[in-house]
Amino acid sequence: MRKFTAFACGTGAGLAAYYLQKLRDPQLAVHNSWTNSDRPISECALWDSNWDFRDPKSLVRPQKNDLPQEQNRYNSDLEKHVAKSARHIILIRHGEYLDVGDSDDTHHLTDRGRLQAKYTGQRLRELGIKWDKVIASNMVRAQETADIILNQIDYDKAKLKHCSYLREGAPIPPQPPVGHWKPEASQFFRDGARIEAAFRRYFHRALPEQEKESYTLIVGHGNVIRYFVCRALQFPAEAWLRISINHASITWLTISPSGNVSIKYLGDTGFMPAKYLTHRIPRDAKNVV
């Protein structure tokens, strides 16, 4: 009888331990939603606060010891590198254009594309923003879009900056891949480095000496803007082709002094009449993407 009791107790304890272990198995745990998990679901969910390499702690010499003078030195150096204001980066995709000819010089906006750009300029004017910088890709369709927008907003055309880094291209092989658009590996190699360089040039927290919020307007291209959005929000960059943005749409990203990034608008064209909404090259043009 004692042997049977001991056997029963041992078996019961073993089953209880097994059951408790199974309950702890994260693959079997059930939450009301993913947000109830006490751990990030994927590594991509972890935010890199030093993504722009401007986190103050990464810019000063580490504290050597706990002596008061060393603490004062460290805190003083840290304070000199702390950003005080937010940066707003507003990205505009060019208007609809015709892909006619083999040269960028022939890729002009359509009449509808010009109207799209005008509506966008009017919308930006209504927002009442005081622009600190306006930058445009040096491709014809972006230059024409920027020129039309500048006719609508309060900004000196002579101050417009032209940037070859913002030219359209193939930033990174997309996931999932698509059958209708397959650039050569050499194009990703070439364009990817340039577009990433553009991201690093324009996306970073404010300098410590910037005392008030700044507004930068960038007129560019669909692929580049979508890549910028993924990089800025620390989404997988390969996801850029999952996003669709209309011609002359507004995308608004804000970089806070802490380095956190938020998105206010993504491809906004709600201010345009529906008949002017487009996102592809017209059907009568070649090389439709």
From Swiss-Prot:
One of its GO terms (cellular component) is mitochondrial outer membrane. It is found in: Mitochondrion outer membrane. The chain crosses the membrane at residues 7-23. Pfam families: His_Phos_1. It is a single-pass membrane protein. Keywords: Hydrolase, Membrane, Mitochondrion, Mitochondrion outer membrane, Transmembrane, Transmembrane helix. GO terms for biological process: positive regulation of mitochondrial fission; positive regulation of mitochondrial fusion; protein dephosphorylation; response to anesthetic; response to heat. Gene3D superfamilies: Phosphoglycerate mutase-like (3.40.50.1240). It is an enzyme of class 3 (hydrolase). It comes from the Eukaryota. SMART domains: PGAM. GO terms for molecular function: kinase binding; phosphoprotein phosphatase activity; protein serine/threonine kinase activator activity; protein serine/threonine phosphatase activity. The keyword Transcription regulation does not apply. Its main location: mitochondrion. It catalyses: O-phospho-L-seryl-[protein] + H2O = L-seryl-[protein] + phosphate; O-phospho-L-threonyl-[protein] + H2O = L-threonyl-[protein] + phosphate. Interacts with Pk92B/ASK1. PANTHER family: PHOSPHOGLYCERATE MUTASE-RELATED (PTHR20935), SERINE_THREONINE-PROTEIN PHOSPHATASE PGAM5, MITOCHONDRIAL (PTHR20935:SF0). Belongs to the phosphoglycerate mutase family. BPG-dependent PGAM subfamily. This is Serine/threonine-protein phosphatase Pgam5, mitochondrial. It comes from Drosophila virilis (Fruit fly). The gene is Pgam5.
